[in-house]
Swiss-Prot record:
Keyword hit for Transferase: yes
Biological processes annotated in GO: DNA-templated transcription
Enzyme Commission number, as recorded: 2.7.7.6
Entry keyword set: Cytoplasm, DNA-binding, DNA-directed RNA polymerase, Nucleotidyltransferase, Transcription, Transferase
Matches recorded under InterPro entries: DNA-dir_RpoC_beta_prime, RNA_pol_Rpb1_5, RPO1C
Entry similarity comment: Belongs to the RNA polymerase beta' chain family.
HAMAP family: RNApol_arch_Rpo1C
Species whose genome carries this gene: Thermoplasma acidophilum (strain ATCC 25905 / DSM 1728 / JCM 9062 / NBRC 15155 / AMRC-C165)
Principal cellular location given in the protein's record: cytoplasm
NCBIfam families according to UniProt: RNA_pol_rpoA2 (TIGR02389)
Protein name in the entry: DNA-directed RNA polymerase subunit Rpo1C
Length: 508
């Protein structure tokens, strides 16, 4: 939101406070989208916050407090003025640059977000002092680290405290990437080397024959390939706090989540002579899954072009167009017909975790959108390993975090330690375009702007022919294309030019 910034006198501020709501005339064209403002009286920081309810053109017949007597252009209606903790000019930006000096008037944007303001208020003065000291030294500390330092500051003493902050600053400086460093190849090396030690295996859920989860190298390949459907999609579903210890509610949710098709609870018999399909429900299976005959009838009634009859506890279905092909198609359609549950959730099991007897539901199959709509499910903790589905339901930032978490977890389960920043770089590259793209010829590598880089990866002839037809120009800005033509790459020392400046000749 745009804010109006201006420099004023204590006399004018006192006049505004006395006459609230006050009309204030200025020699500046104020935009109509301004809703608040900040006033400085010392040219160093803003000490007053102003609520503006309206902006209109100046008219001489309006009685208003004036900042200057000549060249008046706008009248601001000021509803409220409050004194605030001094705000630095550095918290405002004008035209993409940080505000450094206050002229007469400026329209600027405040950089502090609501979230930062909300959580920043909860910090103690000691923690805030540590954060400020760190910023003064040129680096930023996480709040958790600042809290630990503030807690032990008295124990260490002031001299040790300053030395520790100095050492932290030096360590952070050492960890920063060097200018023009080839971060991509280092990330590839750092992930690829441990990746060679990963096993090709699938994890099996103990005691549940149908449930498997792909881990190791196959899972890592799935992640970087951005597979639309993972080989073993699964969900971890948490219930709301009021339900997660209630056994009856948990079992009810499990049964409502599982996708129950007709083939799960009934035998399907095809009579070629009579051209009919008979559905014979199994009483034990229907009781276990809380299925009534009425539920099966309702599911079958959704099929068009059939005649349905119920006879002695079984359902007889006949296609209106009598043919063997129609009969076969009808049989296959009935097998996969959903009676109840959520589509895509093939299996669900509940497990007790932790000392507090809290239930967590694990599923084979995934359908994040529909699961989050179940009343008892906690949408803030429920998770799926289907990254593309996360992108479709929760957005690209959630998908970026999912790529990072899934890759990190896959490596850690194999006992491999990879710096998270390498994985963050991969996640950023896969999602920066706004959609999840694979690391391969169909994704990042196949969509590079360089013709030679695309051709060097895969399908060389196609890329070169298409580039020739379209008249593409390669500016040789990347790594692969410069290596191909035998030029130094524009990274590291190849990114800068060295100019020799000799010493001037001295007169003898």
């Amino acid at each position: 939101m745009a804010s109006l910034l201006w420099r004023d006198t204590s006399k004018n501020i006192a006049a505004i406070l006395e006459k609230l709501p006050a009309d204030y005339a200025v020699d500046y064209d104020v935009p109509n989208n301004v809703e608040d403002g900040y006033i400085t009286i010392n040219k160093k920081n803003f000490t007053y916050h102003v609520v503006i309810s309206g902006v209109r053109k100046y008219s001489p017949d309006v009685e208003a407090i004036v900042k200057k007597k000549s060249g008046l252009k706008s009248i601001i209606t000021i509803e409220k003025v409050e004194k605030i903790e001094p705000l630095s000019f550095m918290e405002f930006r004008v035209g993409g640059k940080t505000l450094e000096a206050m002229g007469s008037f400026e329209v600027a944007e405040r950089q502090v977000t609501e979230i930062k303001e909300k959580y920043g208020e909860n910090l103690s003065e000691d923690v805030q002092k540590v954060l400020d000291d760190a910023r003064a030294m040129g680096f930023t500390l996480p709040e958790s680290v600042a809290e630990e330092i503030a807690r032990r500051r008295t124990e260490w003493g002031e001299k040790a405290y300053k030395n520790i902050l100095k050492r932290i600053g030096e360590e952070i400086g050492n960890e920063l990437i060097d200018p023009y460093e080839a971060v991509g190849i280092i990330a590839a090396q750092s992930i690829g080397e441990p990746g060679t030690q990963m096993t090709m295996r699938t994890f099996h859920f103990a005691g549940v024959r149908e449930m498997n989860v792909t881990l190791g190298l196959p899972r890592l390949i799935e992640i970087v390939d951005a597979r639309r459907i993972p080989s073993t999609p699964s969900m971890t579903i948490y219930l709301r706090p009021e339900y997660e210890t209630n056994d009856e509610v948990v079992m009810d949710v499990v049964k409502r989540l599982e996708n129950t098709s007709i083939s799960d609870v009934a035998d399907i018999i095809t009579d070629i002579g009579e051209l009919t399909v008979t559905v014979r429900p199994d009483p034990r299976k229907t009781k276990d899954r809380l299925i009534e005959m009425e539920d099966i009838m309702n599911a079958i009634s959704k099929i068009k072009g059939i005649t349905v009859m119920e006879d002695s506890g079984q359902i007889i279905i006949k296609p209106q167009q009598e043919s063997f092909k129609k009969l076969y198609l009808l049989q296959e359609q009935i097998k996969g017909l959903t009676i109840k549950g959520i589509s895509g959730i093939k299996r669900a099991i509940a497990r007790v975790e932790g000392k507090e007897h809290r239930w967590v539901i694990y599923t084979q199959g995934s359908n994040l959108k529909d699961v989050l709509e179940v009343d008892e499910v906690d949408p803030t903790r429920t998770y799926t390993n289907d990254i593309v589905e996360i992108a479709n339901v929760l957005g690209i930032e959630a998908a970026r975090n999912a790529i990072l978490n899934e890759a990190l977890r896959t490596l850690q389960e194999q006992g491999l330690n990879v710096d998270v920043r390498h994985l963050m770089l991969v996640a950023d590259m896969m999602t920066f375009s706004g959609s999840v793209r694979a690391v391969g010829r169909t994704g990042i590598s196949g969509r590079k702007s360089s013709v030679l880089a695309r051709a060097a990866f895969e399908i060389t002839t196609k890329h070169l022919l298409r580039a020739g037809i379209m008249g593409e120009v390669d500016k040789l800005a990347g790594v692969a294309e410069n290596i191909i033509v035998g030029q130094p790459i524009t990274l590291g020392t190849g990114a800068v030019d060295i100019i020799y400046k000799g010493y001037p000749k001295t007169k003898k």
